[in-house]
Each structure stands twice: as C-alpha cells, then as structure tokens.
C-alpha cells in the first residue's frame, strides 16, 4: 500500500506547547463526532503529545467540559 494513501494531518499544536484540559476548542479538533479520540497516525502528534492529549481529554470529560459520548452522532 502506498504511503500517500493516508493524508497526514498537520498538527495545530507546536512541539513544546502545553495541552490544557480547559481548552475545549483545541481538544474538539482531536475527537470524532462520536466522541472518540483520534489515533496518532491521523492527528500527526508526537507520542508524548498524544499521551498528554489523551489525559487532557479524559480529564475534561471527568469535569464535564466534554461529553463522554455525543448523543447526536
């Protein structure tokens, strides 16, 4: 399979920028319409950024800034 099959998304997060759980607009860019976290191969994030993003999304869900599941999806 060709490597150009998947279109790599450019990350809106620069290396070194913090990922904050209160920045809901940023977190929504990395979540599907069903509420799932996008995989690293689609987001273009580094491994550390993906871990930080996952923790931020989970924390935002716990404090009710993001829904666990999108009922409209």
Swiss-Prot record:
What keywords is this UniProt entry annotated with?
Organellar chromatophore, Plastid, Ribonucleoprotein, Ribosomal protein, RNA-binding, rRNA-binding
> Does the keyword RNA-binding belong to this entry?
yes
Concerning Pfam families, the annotation shows: Ribosomal_S18
Gene Ontology MF: a single term = small ribosomal subunit rRNA binding
Q: Quick one: a GO cellular component term? A: plastid
Record GO biological process: translation
Q: Where in the cell is it found?
A: Plastid, Organellar chromatophore
InterPro entries the record matches: Ribosomal_bS18 (IPR001648), Ribosomal_bS18_CS (IPR018275), Ribosomal_bS18_sf (IPR036870)
- Has UniProt tagged this entry with the keyword rRNA-binding? yes
Q: How is the subunit organization of this protein annotated in UniProt? A: Part of the 30S ribosomal subunit.
Q: Which family does it belong to?
A: Belongs to the bacterial ribosomal protein bS18 family.
The molecule here is called Small ribosomal subunit protein bS18c
- Which organism is this entry from? Paulinella chromatophora
Q: What's the name of its gene?
A: rpl36
